[in-house]
Swiss-Prot record:
Organism for this UniProt entry: Pongo abelii
Entry note: cofactor: Binds 1 zinc ion per subunit.
Annotated catalytic residues: 371
Binding-site positions, Zn(2+): 370, 374, 393
Subunit structure: Heterodimer with ERAP1.
Molecular function terms from GO: metalloaminopeptidase activity; peptide binding; zinc ion binding
Topological domain ranges for the Lumenal compartment: 41-960
Listed name of the protein: Endoplasmic reticulum aminopeptidase 2
PANTHER family attached to this UniProt entry: ENDOPLASMIC RETICULUM AMINOPEPTIDASE 2 (PTHR11533:SF239), PROTEASE M1 ZINC METALLOPROTEASE (PTHR11533)
Disulfide bonds: 421-460, 759-766
Disulfide bond listed as a keyword: yes
Length: 960
């Protein structure tokens, strides 16, 4: 799964501790080998203690008290029939689950949520007591755990197979989970309905009763009944269609490979598709609503190239004969990797050359690469439990880098990947962060695991490990991991083992030597030892939270190194600082270069302090070469002065990514109280000579951040001087920008950012040009093709008049391009009139003109503006209960709404206001991790202003 960030630019102690053992039933059932990682008691039966178990909805005792399912009954195969009615907006369904019983039991526990069970029966071909068809079962329901219990009249016997048949029905969901309805508007204005599934992480149980945990892998045979005007899609190819009475059709699909329930998918719609064949014969199809079929061609081209790449890179063929990618009009996340039927938000799959910018193209390519990587990481090899969600999400995010670089080098994603790491450092440098791998049991806790730590930090430590091991060894290791655990589940240690012993069978059959390959000298560290070495190093990154700070002090030819925990908003002089540093130690794979040599030196820092000797005297040392390491670097003494001097004299002597890293680190260190703000601002002087777009954008992003912070606080003297400084120093590069789509991807992204900044600062030439283009666009009735990279800027300037704002809202409703709608919605949110902003929010809540899927991002962008910040926050407080009816408590949307409307506050009054609101929620969410993150972020903002406001004011007076 990937969360959408297109409009904003942009997952306890276990209640059920299973002692993991290994058993295999092959000896008893030679025709079946079911190997799993469970241990079970000798039998399951009712407790005589009436207080030991919860109470079912009918008042009887429910026979199971844990959140996790018992492992005594293992699903092997589901026969699932579904008939959705797109008129009455409900569905009827039935299933027959083949299960294997490992120990005697009186009950079967499954997951089920909001389903009406109308009948349940049991049959067995191996147990004589259940050979007669239709032995009816009593069904108990315990909604608090989203579980049902099927009570059997006589104990099920060990090592026998049974068939559980269940009939059930439900309404199609109004939200974005389970089996739900989505709508779209045709060019002619007609509203049409489709039925779609989205099951990750714990919503398959909303569509059919099942063993809804990733460890319970099974095969699925799916049948879908539909009307003739619709098509049905599922994970596997359709094998036949049966005509029924009344004009209905029933599609039967091939049985799936063995997989987890969260990957099951089926859709009934009237979409059209374009198709192609990969070099290995896989049919790839892109589906979209009929009027948007012309926007699917880039996705098809990219999918074919990326699937071919992954098959070669992983040395494993994609195991299905087809792969469908479909753009869903209502979709909460960016995309979902259902095996063979990947679902996408429209902005993550469709590309319209007339309205999609360079950034849009990069986003679509990344999301496709991410979801295709999941067909191996996540689908073929699945984490044992959601605490290790990073094993699939971190890898998929990392594989975006590898795959996009290989297939579309012109998109220059290698440079952009730095932002993936910089984004998560903001959160990971707070004390309220969490380890990558963290216990999660409830559905809400599991949903909270889908966050920047699992995705971005997971990807960044994998990139660091690849740089440490070397590309070839790392690739061999992940190939071994995928081959060894295909169609199975894995945990952290399994990955470290594969990366430590990355010998493939081919290495030995060809007579190769793997464990001490002499070819791997550039990145292979001679002291990298056995299995425990990689595990020992990487557990310091996955099992403890936070990010290390490397403190470097140069003394002649000697470097004194020290590692600390890097914390934003907690300063060394604060009383709590020392306690927050205790027990934190990372094994950091360091890299560094010097002014005297381009050679990349390597060292692992395993202790709190260490000393390195340089071979020759050097004027400066730069650690974390190309920012491949996940750590911040602080140069004590004259270290920063020497680097800033070098940037001003000849910045090209430092590598482009190193310049980006220096800008990032220097401003991060200001937030941690380790550097004064004037030192960081002095570094920005060199940017007027910078030609690397990533470095320019990194520096500008901090200056723009400070400007908007002052603007929101109405500190007008500083905001005006910052505006003057920005236009004074960057006017030449702003004025060089053409209002076109010319140049490389980075040229185009720089153009968008610079012109947006110029118009935000009311730079007269920018406002004049944007106004001119907007007027021409209105006069052409929206037919004029404005260059895509400046489209958002033109719309934003146009939205500042009443006529322009109203016209944009009309065009938003009419547009057939989701990329254009995103740009229009952003522009509408920049209005300075609060009644217009409130109208947008109300339309988002209603969900007709502005789809509810966009509400969280809309509130986020509105809150970024001075006129919208308090408005958005007040709306959230007043409508919290209504918001929880639209989005799950721990969902990405709720977390974005909370952080987006509060995290920019920077006063003690607002901190208290937010804190009191969170405390008032109690069961409605006061326990969410995001609340502590927000409170700490606001505190950090307050301390930043207290410490740096006088310095910023003085520095600007001197430099403008």
């Amino acid at each position: 799964m990937l969360h959408s960030s297109a409009m904003v630019n942009s997952h306890r102690k276990s209640m059920f501790n299973i002692h993991k053992g290994f058993y295999c039933l092959a000896a008893i059932l030679p025709q079946i080998c079911i190997c799993s990682q469970f241990s079970v008691p000798s039998s399951y039966h009712f407790s005589e203690d009436p207080g030991a178990f919860p109470v079912a909805t009918n008042g009887e005792r429910f026979p199971w008290q844990e959140l996790r399912l018992p492992s005594v009954v293992i699903p092997l195969h589901y026969d699932l029939f579904v008939h959705p009615n797109l008129t009455s907006l409900d569905f009827v369904a039935s299933e027959k689950i083949e299960v294997l019983v490992s120990n005697a039991t009186q009950f079967i526990i499954l997951h089920s949520k909001d389903l009406e069970i109308t009948n349940a029966t049991l049959q067995s071909e191996e147990d004589s007591r259940y050979m007669k068809p239709g032995k009816e079962l009593k069904v108990l329901s315990y909604p608090a755990h989203q579980q049902i219990a099927l009570l059997v009249p006589e104990k099920l016997m060990p090592h026998l197979k049974y068939y559980v048949a269940i009939d059930f029905q439900a309404k199609l969901g109004d939200g974005f989970e389970g089996f739900y309805k989505s709508t779209y508007r045709t060019l002619g204005g007609e509203t049409r309905i489709l039925a779609v599934t989205d099951f990750e992480p714990t919503q398959a149980r909303m569509a059919f009763p099942c063993f809804d945990e990733p460890l319970f892998k099974a095969n699925f045979s799916i049948k879908i009944r539909r009307e003739s005007g619709h098509i049905a899609l599922s994970n596997m190819p359709k094998v036949r269609t049966i005509e029924l009475e009344g004009g209905l059709l029933e599609d039967h699909f091939e049985t799936t490979v063995k997989m987890s329930t969260y990957l099951v998918a089926y859709i009934v719609c009237d979409f059209h598709s374009v198709s192609g064949i990969t070099s290995s014969g896989v049919k790839v199809s892109i589906y979209a609503s009929p009027d948007k079929q012309n926007q699917t061609h880039y996705a098809l081209q990219a999918s074919l190239k990326l699937l071919d790449f992954y098959e070669k890179y992983f040395d494993i063929y994609y195991p299905l004969s087809k792969l469908d990618l479909i753009a869903i009009p209502d979709f909460a996340s960016g995309a979902m990797e259902n095996w063979g039927l990947i679902t996408y938000r429209e902005t993550s799959l469709l590309f319209d050359p007339k309205t999609s910018s360079a950034s849009d193209k990069l986003w679509v390519t990344r999301v496709i690469a991410h979801e295709l990587a999941h067909q191996w990481f996540g689908n073929l090899v699945t984490m044992e439990w959601w605490n290790d969600i990073w094993l699939k999400e971190g890898f998929a995010k990392y594989m975006e880098l590898i795959a996009v670089n290989a297939t579309y080098p012109e998109l220059q994603f290698d440079d952009y990947f730095l932002n993936v790491c910089f984004e998560v450092i903001t959160k990971d440098s707070l004390n309220s962060s969490r380890p990558i791998s963290k216990p999660a049991e409830t559905p809400t806790q599991i949903q909270e695991m889908f966050d920047e730590v699992s995705y971005n930090k997971g990807a960044c430590i994998l990139n660091m490990l690849k740089d440490f091991l070397g590309e070839e060894k790392f690739q061999k290791g992940i190939i071994q991991y995928l081959k060894k655990f295909s169609y199975r589940n894995a945990k952290n240690d399994d990955l470290w083992s594969s990366l430590s012993n990355s010998c493939l069978e081919s290495d030995f059959t060809s007579g190769g030597v793997c464990h001490s390959d002499p070819k791997m000298t550039s990145n292979m560290l001679t002291f990298l030892g056995e299995n425990a070495e990689v595990k020992e190093m990487m557990t310091t990154w996955t099992l403890q939270k936070g990010i290390p700070l490397l403190v470097v002090k140069q003394d002649g030819c000697s470097l004194r190194l020290q590692q600390e925990r890097f914390l934003q908003g907690v300063f060394q002089e604060d009383p709590e600082w020392r306690a927050l540093q205790e027990r934190y130690l990372w094994h950091i794979p360091l890299t560094y270069s010097t002014s005297s040599s381009n050679v990349i030196h390597r060292h692992i820092l395993k202790s709190k302090t260490d000393t390195l000797d340089l071979p020759e005297k050097t004027s400066w040392v730069k650690f974390n070469v190309d920012s491949n390491g996940y750590y911040i670097v602080h140069y004590e003494g004259h270290g920063w002065d020497q680097l800033i001097t070098q940037l001003n004299q000849n910045h090209t002597l430092l590598r482009p990514k190193d310049r980006v890293g220096l800008i990032h680190d220097v401003f991060q260190l200001v937030g941690a109280g380790r550097l004064t703000l004037d030192k960081a601002l002095d570094m920005t002087h060199y940017l007027q000579h910078e030609t690397s777009s990533p470095a320019l954008l990194e520096g500008l992003s901090y200056l723009e951040l400070f400007y908007h912070m002052m603007d929101r606080r109405n500190i007008s003297d500083i905001s005006e001087n910052l505006k003057r400084y920005l236009l004074q120093y960057f006017k030449p590069v702003i004025d060089r920008q053409s209002w076109s789509d010319e140049g490389s991807v980075w040229d185009r992204m720089l153009r968008s950012a610079l012109l947006k900044l110029a118009c935000d600062l009311n730079h007269a030439p920018c406002i004049q040009k944007a106004t001119e283009l907007f007027s021409q666009w209105m006069e052409s009735s929206g037919k004029l093709n404005i260059p895509t990279d400046v489209l958002k800027i033109v719309y934003s300037v146009g939205a500042q008049t009443a006529a322009g704002w109203n016209y944009l809202l009309e065009q938003y409703e009419l547009s057939m391009s989701s990329a254009e709608q995103n740009k229009i919605l952003y522009a509408l949110s920049t209005s300075k009139h609060q009644e217009k902003l409130l109208k947008l929010i109300e339309l988002g809540m209603e969900g007709k003109v502005i789809k509810t899927q966009n509400l969280a991002a809309l509130l986020h962008v509105i809150a970024r503006r001075p006129k919208g910040q308090q408005l958005a926050w007040d709306f959230v407080r007043e409508n919290w209960t209504h918001l929880l009816k639209k989005f799950d408590l721990g969902s990405f949307d709720i977390r974005m709404i909370i952080s987006g409307t509060t995290a920019r506050f920077s006063s003690k009054d607002k901190l208290q206001e937010v804190k009191l609101f969170f405390e008032s929620l109690e069961a409605q969410g006061s326990h969410l991790d995001i609340f502590q993150i927000v409170l700490e972020t606001i505190t950090k903002n307050i301390k930043w202003l207290e410490k740096n406001l006088p310095t910023l004011r003085t520095w600007l007076l001197v430099n403008t």
